[in-house]
């Protein structure tokens, strides 16, 4: 795996799924391929994106700044600085300075990532802030290693939270989760559907599902009433994919 592929993988792992994720992936690909060289416009676009947490925006802004060639005196952006200040906690700043000194001695991406992984997310963000604000300089490879370590920590905590959701025993949470997943799968079916006969069938199933979920939410239903909702939908989606000759593992 090339360095930039690895960076893209880690960064995208902390972006919530949806159309915006696809858009960010495209921007990252363009930047890494040297196709997008207008850092100012890129940062303005990033700043106004909805859904993303300030820290995710800060990390993306940091990556764009590292990889897009720009004039030396280009202004640093406040939204990135605020996100990478370690919540203003002086402990984070102290640890960030210690980490920075260690990173100065590193020359490889993987070496930097290994060193950084033993620090907290707050300290890692503060360290990125130091580099972003030009208070310290490290090689681009080392800075990207720091980025990936931060993303790995964030993705780990998100994964734990998703796992807790998947194993939640509260029937109301499970009920709502099934309806959300059914709705999302229905949306995916609608996006995949082209204009063939089978597509019309898939659209019909998806539309009915979404109406059903809407009705269940409006009138309030028993937690067990959603059992099987997502599974039925997934079976329909997989049958439709087979007929269309499409294999999309990610919906399983």
UniProtKB/Swiss-Prot annotation:
This is Matrix protein 1. Its main location: virion. Most abundant protein in virion. When expressed alone can form virus-like particles in transfected cells. It is found in: Virion membrane; Host nucleus. Residues 165-252 are annotated as: RNP-binding. Belongs to the influenza viruses Matrix protein M1 family. Disulfide bonds: none annotated. It comes from the Viruses. InterPro entries: Flu_matrix_M1, Flu_matrix_M1_C, Flu_matrix_M1_N, Flu_matrix_M1_N_sub1, Flu_matrix_M1_N_sub2, INFV_M1. GO terms for molecular function: RNA binding; structural constituent of virion. It is a peripheral membrane protein. The gene is M. A motif (Nuclear localization signal) lies at residues 101-105. One of its GO terms (cellular component) is host cell nucleus. Keywords: Host nucleus, Membrane, RNA-binding, Viral matrix protein, Virion. The lineage of its organism: Viruses, Riboviria, Orthornavirae, Negarnaviricota, Polyploviricotina. Plays critical roles in virus replication, from virus entry and uncoating to assembly and budding of the virus particle. M1 binding to ribonucleocapsids (RNPs) in nucleus seems to inhibit viral transcription. Interaction of viral NEP with M1-RNP is thought to promote nuclear export of the complex, which is targeted to the virion assembly site at the apical plasma membrane in polarized epithelial cells. Interactions with NA and HA may bring M1, a non-raft-associated protein, into lipid rafts. Forms a continuous shell on the inner side of the lipid bilayer in virion, where it binds the RNP. HAMAP family: INFV_M1. Residues 1-164 are annotated as: Membrane-binding. The keyword RNA-binding applies. GO terms for biological process: viral budding from plasma membrane. Homodimer and homomultimer. Interacts with NEP. Binds ribonucleocapsid by both interacting with genomic RNA and NP protein. May interact with HA and NA. Cannot bind NP without genomic RNA.
